[in-house]
């Protein structure tokens, strides 16, 4: 942006206008811009005739202002113009003058014939034909041309101050800021053409070049005259006697500041686009100026606050005016490095804007700054908030008064509501504190359990497993076993505890697996023949369809054994290989849960070995082979210990004729892996591997003891449903504390002794008091 301080030495009132060389754009046609089009050949230059395309001619016709506008604007030029600025003839012998035979062409001059001559300003034999320029005209010249201009003007200042201020009569008086108190008649210098009004309104007066009061200036020469710094410096030089003879002419900067800091001036005017121009402050920027002496003090009239406000008024319109473009001619030259903002729409066209990419955030910020509004996301409806908001407790409730459309509460009612609200909040806080303590206690127990598992893992790995056969029956190992096996050694301990009495090898597993795959391929072909021939139930249960159906229902919450899960194929392979290994047993519903627990803790081949040996145990073999007589013996033995430990609940079950087979079959078939949480079922498996089948029935008694009070309040249907689907919030500590309270001795007889006596009684046909056997 150009400010008043950038005018400098080039803002003289009556400078001699020198021609400005036309720009020579690279890669384009050389062309001198007309007087109405820009600075290509200086003000008043005429483009030499040449051919132009239709588009350029249309633009020129549209953009060229009226002839009278230029005449009125340049009517102030009264000094000698250099060649190339007009067609007026020059004195013979002068450079650029036409030959003597040529007739004068004063009628062709763009400045018109109304120019006034001032003989007192004749210098160098030149006859001036035009009046002086205004302050704004000289501001369009580059700095170097201004300095040459002032050197040429130095010879034309001997005529005195009054002669230099002469103006043609018949012009309008210019009243800029600060002219309110001037004389109504004014001096001749206060008259100018109507087009000078915007220029004179700038009232540019260099602050450090003002004349003190009484130094030969009249009242009409103060703000309205708008003298430049160069003219005032020359006036001081004349008053002092002028420069010494023989001394070289001083530069504009030296005459302006007396050798101090050079004045700022216009320089390097560039054309960027239509109706726009650019001013590069390469020469006027203070960071490029050489160091100078102390600044020239301001006059006394402008040192106070009133002078500062006057300077602000005088300089306020200068920058605003020069941002407008009075020369809309498009120039063909390279784009300047410095980009300018688009100019004003002066002659009907708007300059093209540069296609600058703006992000949505910048556009939103500009819109908000322009409109004063901020964009906020649309608020959600209150109905949706009411559905989504669910307070965790009554502490989220806020006590509010009644709406304004309802009668106000009385004092007693308001106090009662406040008291009730405080009680509700207090109860809610107590409940939350209790729950927080409970969660904290559970976390402490979990951390303690993890620490115990970590310490036990070291003992199992370093001491017990290397000496398994020696230490497995020791009291220390049995106590560690009861507390639960560390997950890292659980699979290994299970394999050692179950053993491999069947001597199954991984190679044997691969053989049975390949047979199972062949059987699955031929299953679709032989299924119809098997149905007609009447195959056994075991063969039908070993079919692929039954295995697939049971696998999809194995631990459905884990989503690892279903189709597409990581262990689906492994589980399918183990079950299929076992049906080929034991066709007499085949596949029974519930085997998938046992195989799945083994897969989670062992490798595929080791899981198959443990699975086959585990199902080969007497109790599992009797249940999976559906040996009804053996199953009744296990139920009778269970009832003996049931009556011994839970006599009250035993009588309650007996009153409803609730036999053990209703709830024990599912527990024994799946080894509690389906009825209990998985981590609790694994701990049951740990002790089952240590104690054998006895612990399975002891665990059943522990579950009945845990829910004894609840079961005593239920009838037959609800008891059966409850025991089939146990609660999920059961904890290992509570369950194992109830299991530990079960005594597996009846009249100094242990489980094995009681089971043997039951079998003997059945063989002898003796009377048996078991409700299951009676039925």
UniProtKB/Swiss-Prot annotation:
Disordered, as annotated region: 1-66, 94-312
Family matches, as InterPro entries: Rab-GAP-TBC_dom (IPR000195), Rab-GAP_TBC_sf (IPR035969), Rab_GAP_TBC_domain (IPR050302)
Example of a GO biological process term: regulation of autophagosome assembly
GO CC list: autophagosome; recycling endosome
Keyword 4Fe-4S tagged: no
Positions carrying Phosphoserine: 284, 315, 747
UniProt protein name: TBC1 domain family member 12
Matches recorded under PANTHER family: RAB GTPASE-ACTIVATING PROTEIN 1-LIKE, TBC1 DOMAIN FAMILY MEMBER 12 ISOFORM X1
Gene: TBC1D12
Phosphothreonine modification, residue list: 748
Entry keywords, A to Z: Acetylation, Coiled coil, Endosome, GTPase activation, Phosphoprotein
Feature: compositional bias, Polar residues: 270-283
Residue spans of biased composition, Low complexity class: 212-230
Oligomeric and partner information: Interacts with RAB11A; this interaction recruits TBC1D12 to RAB11A-positive recycling endosomes.
Short name of one Pfam family: RabGAP-TBC
Subcellular location: Endosome
């Amino acid at each position: 942006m150009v400010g008043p301080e950038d005018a400098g030495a080039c803002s003289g009132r009556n400078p001699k206008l020198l021609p400005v060389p036309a720009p020579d754009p690279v890669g384009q046609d050389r062309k001198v811009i007309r007087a109405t089009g820009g600075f290509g050949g200086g003000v008043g230059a005429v483009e030499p005739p040449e051919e132009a395309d239709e588009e350029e001619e249309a633009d020129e016709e549209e953009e060229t202002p009226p002839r009278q506008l230029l005449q009125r604007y340049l009517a102030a030029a009264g000094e000698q113009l250099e060649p190339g600025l007009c067609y007026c003839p020059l004195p013979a012998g002068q450079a650029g003058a036409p030959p003597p035979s040529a007739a004068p062409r004063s009628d062709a001059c763009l400045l018109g014939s109304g120019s006034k001559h001032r003989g007192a300003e004749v210098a160098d034999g030149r006859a001036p034909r035009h009046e002086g320029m205004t302050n704004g005209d000289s501001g369009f010249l580059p700095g170097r041309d201004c300095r040459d201009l002032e050197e040429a003007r130095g010879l034309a200042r001997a005529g005195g101050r009054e002669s230099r201020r002469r103006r043609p009569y018949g012009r309008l008086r210019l009243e800029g800021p600060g002219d309110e108190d001037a004389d109504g008649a004014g001096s001749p210098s206060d008259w100018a053409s109507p087009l000078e009004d915007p220029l004179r309104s700038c009232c540019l007066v260099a602050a450090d070049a003002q004349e003190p009061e009484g130094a030969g200036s009249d009242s009409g020469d103060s703000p309205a005259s708008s003298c430049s710094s160069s003219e005032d410096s020359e006036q001081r030089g004349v008053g002092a006697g002028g420069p010494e003879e023989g001394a070289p002419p001083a530069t504009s900067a030296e005459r302006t500041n007396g050798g101090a800091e050079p004045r700022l001036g216009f320089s390097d005017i560039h054309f960027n686009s239509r109706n726009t121009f650019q001013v590069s402050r390469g020469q006027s920027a203070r960071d490029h100026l050489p160091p100078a002496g102390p600044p020239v003090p301001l006059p006394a009239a402008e040192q106070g606050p009133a002078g500062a406000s006057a300077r602000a008024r005088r300089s306020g319109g200068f920058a605003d005016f020069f941002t407008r473009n009075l020369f809309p001619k498009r120039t063909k030259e390279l784009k300047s490095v410095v980009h300018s903002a688009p100019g004003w729409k002066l002659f009907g066209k708007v300059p093209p804007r540069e296609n600058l990419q703006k992000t949505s955030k910048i556009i939103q910020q500009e819109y908000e700054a322009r409109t004063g509004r901020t964009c906020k996301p649309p608020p959600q409806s209150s109905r949706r908030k009411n559905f989504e908001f669910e307070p965790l407790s009554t502490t989220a409730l806020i006590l509010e008064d009644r709406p304004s459309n309802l009668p106000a509460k009385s004092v007693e009612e308001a106090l009662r509501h406040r008291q009730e609200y405080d009680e509700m909040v207090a109860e809610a806080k107590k409940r939350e504190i209790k729950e927080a303590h409970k969660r904290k206690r559970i976390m402490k127990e979990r951390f303690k359990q993890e620490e115990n598992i970590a310490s036990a893992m070291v003992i199992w790995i370093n001491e017990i497993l290397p000496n398994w056969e020696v230490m497995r029956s020791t009291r220390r190992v049995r106590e560690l076993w009861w507390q639960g096996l560390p997950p890292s050694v659980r699979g290994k301990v299970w394999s050692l505890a179950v053993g491999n009495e069947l001597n199954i090898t991984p190679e044997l597993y691969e053989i049975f697996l390949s047979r199972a795959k062949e059987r699955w391929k031929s299953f679709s072909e032989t299924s119809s023949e098997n149905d007609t021939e009447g195959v056994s139930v075991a063969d039908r249960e070993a079919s692929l369809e039954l295995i697939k159906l049971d696998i999809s229902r194995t631990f459905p919450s884990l989503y690892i054994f279903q189709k597409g899960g990581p262990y689906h194929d492994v589980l399918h392979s183990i079950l299929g290989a076992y049906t080929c290994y034991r066709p007499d047993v085949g596949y029974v519903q519930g085997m998938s849960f046992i195989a799945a627990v083994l897969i989670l803790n062992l490798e595929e081949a080791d899981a198959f070995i443990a699975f086959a040996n585990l199902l080969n145990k007497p109790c599992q073999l009797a249940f999976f082979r559906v040996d009804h007589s053996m199953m009744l013996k296990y139920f009778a033995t269970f009832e003996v210990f049931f009556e011994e430990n839970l006599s009250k609940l035993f009588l309650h079950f007996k009153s409803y004729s609730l036999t053990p087979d209703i709830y024990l079959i599912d527990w024994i078939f799946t080894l509690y892996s389906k009825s209990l949480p998985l981590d609790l079922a694994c701990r049951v498996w740990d002790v089952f591997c240590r104690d054998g089948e006895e612990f399975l029935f002891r665990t059943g008694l522990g579950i009945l003891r845990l829910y004894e009070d609840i079961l005593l309040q239920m009838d037959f249907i609800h008891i059966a449903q409850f025991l089939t689907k146990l609660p999920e919030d059961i904890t290992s500590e509570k369950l194992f504390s109830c299991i530990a309270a079960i005594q597996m001795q009846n009249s100094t007889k242990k489980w094995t002794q009681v089971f043997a006596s039951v079998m003997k009684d059945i063989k002898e046909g003796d009377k048996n008091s078991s409700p299951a056997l009676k039925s």
